[in-house]
């Protein structure tokens, strides 16, 4: 048995090292790609300072802004379908007797939501106050990550399955961007994807932080009395957890308005899935390859990317709940050992009890969760499942309505 434990330690260390590299590469790739695209579309005033390794507010060159604005205006004017896209937002008002009224109505609602969400995203990214808040939150995350590394060493990726799901989601997001025939929904998907990518990178770091604290409590708190260094690190980690909880509350202020846009995607989802169902079951003159090609290039990206994004956030939320419950359990076990601690350091016991009380209050008053639409709506897997079934049922209802009224989309 001792031989087995001796073999397990290097295996665990090598796995931890590999997961540490994977976390660093994945988070760095997500953040750098998002940053390059953000700087490329010339919005906002955020910039990374490589010397101090933090984000700063740096106004863009006036000529860069003017040239970028001119190119954006020319691109919109050059887009032949741009006027047609704007007209589709008000078309049902003037054609209420048309056979395609239902299709036009669904299309108009989707267009109106897309225009509204794009305007909101663009205004936020150009707002100086929003930029400052975003920069402060990013720097808080960088600072917390550095503090935890200094105490626990390199952090490890908590869940490879979440990273795989993110990669699959990213591929369908790219396909969704390509599927859009108009420029405005492409811009909306791009800007929304930028913010969601940064939030996913934060979720990966957040999970790695809590997992590292759990591992420290699991492997560094033996049955015998903890040494002075372990007790000092335990108190530091509890203080850092309090900071993590406070930073997460600040991040939610920026995230909730964006999360509401994820829910508003249900209109586009219903439209895309109703077309997918129609093409699969009712276009019998088309071959399987023709159906698949049409669905793939027009509706598949928009039908799967928002669902996978919601599922990803829900899985992250459920993992956070599980890890915080485990952390609470481990702190309870440490609390039960206070009879041993009292023989060592009465000051440690008083500080630990105070920090544990703070932890219990934060866990109940402001738990680390992923909310959507409001602070009272938690975005876990049950919500993601409800979102999926709501999409499917409404899509089937749309198809039934079209069949009952003999509405043809050809």
Curated annotation (Swiss-Prot):
Glycans are attached at residue 272. Keywords: Cell membrane, Glycoprotein, Membrane, Transmembrane, Transmembrane helix. One of its GO terms (cellular component) is membrane. The chain crosses the membrane at residues 18-38, 73-93, 150-170, 190-210, 250-270, 294-314, 379-399. GO terms for molecular function: ligand-gated channel activity. It is a multi-pass membrane protein. It is found in: Cell membrane. Residues 1-17, 94-149, 211-249, 315-378 are cytoplasmic. The keyword Transmembrane applies. Residues 39-72, 171-189, 271-293, 400-410 are extracellular. One of its GO terms (biological process) is transmembrane transport. Gustatory receptor-like proteins are divergent proteins which do not belong to the canonical gustatory receptor or olfactory receptor families but display some structural similarity. They are predicted to be ligand-gated seven transmembrane domain ion channels. This is Gustatory receptor-like 36a. It comes from Drosophila melanogaster (Fruit fly). The lineage of its organism: Eukaryota, Metazoa, Ecdysozoa, Arthropoda, Hexapoda.
């Amino acid at each position: 048995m001792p031989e087995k434990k001796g073999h397990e330690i290097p295996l665990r260390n090598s796995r931890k090292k590999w997961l540490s590299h994977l976390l660093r590469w994945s988070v760095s790739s997500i953040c750098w790609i998002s940053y390059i695209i953000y700087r490329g579309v010339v919005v906002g005033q955020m910039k990374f300072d490589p010397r101090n390794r933090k984000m700063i507010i740096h106004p863009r060159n006036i000529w860069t802004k003017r040239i970028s604005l001119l190119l954006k205006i020319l691109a919109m004017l050059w887009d032949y379908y741009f006027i047609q896209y704007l007209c589709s937002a008000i078309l049902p008002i003037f054609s209420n007797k048309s056979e395609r009224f239902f299709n036009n109505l669904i299309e108009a609602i989707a267009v109106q939501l897309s225009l509204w969400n794009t305007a909101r995203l663009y205004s936020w990214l150009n707002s100086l106050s929003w930029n400052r808040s975003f920069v402060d939150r990013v720097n808080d995350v960088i600072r917390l990550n550095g503090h935890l590394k200094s105490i626990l060493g390199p952090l490890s990726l908590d869940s490879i399955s979440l990273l795989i799901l993110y990669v699959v989601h990213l591929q369908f997001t790219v396909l969704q961007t390509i599927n859009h025939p108009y420029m405005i929904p492409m811009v909306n998907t791009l800007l929304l994807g930028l913010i969601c990518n940064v939030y996913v990178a934060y979720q990966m770091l957040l999970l790695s932080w809590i997992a590292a604290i759990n591992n420290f409590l699991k492997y560094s708190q033996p049955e015998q009395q903890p040494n002075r260094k372990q007790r000092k690190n335990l108190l530091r980690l509890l203080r850092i957890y309090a900071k993590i909880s406070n930073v997460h509350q600040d991040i939610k202020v920026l995230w909730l308005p964006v999360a509401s846009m994820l829910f508003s995607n249900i209109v586009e989802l219903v439209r895309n899935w109703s077309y997918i169902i129609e093409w699969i079951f009712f276009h019998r003159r088309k071959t399987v390859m023709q159906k698949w090609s049409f669905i793939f290039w027009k509706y598949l990206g928009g039908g799967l990317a928002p669902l996978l994004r919601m599922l990803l956030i829900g899985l992250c939320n459920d993992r956070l709940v599980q890890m915080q419950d485990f952390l609470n359990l481990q702190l309870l076990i440490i609390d039960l050992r206070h009879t041993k601690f009292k023989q060592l350091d009465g000051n440690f016991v008083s500080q630990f009890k105070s920090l544990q009380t703070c932890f219990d209050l934060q866990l109940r008053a402001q738990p680390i969760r992923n909310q959507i639409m409001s602070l009272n709506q938690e975005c876990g897997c049950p919500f993601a499942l409800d979102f999926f079934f709501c999409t499917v049922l409404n899509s089937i209802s749309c198809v039934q309505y079209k069949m009952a009224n003999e509405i043809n989309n050809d």
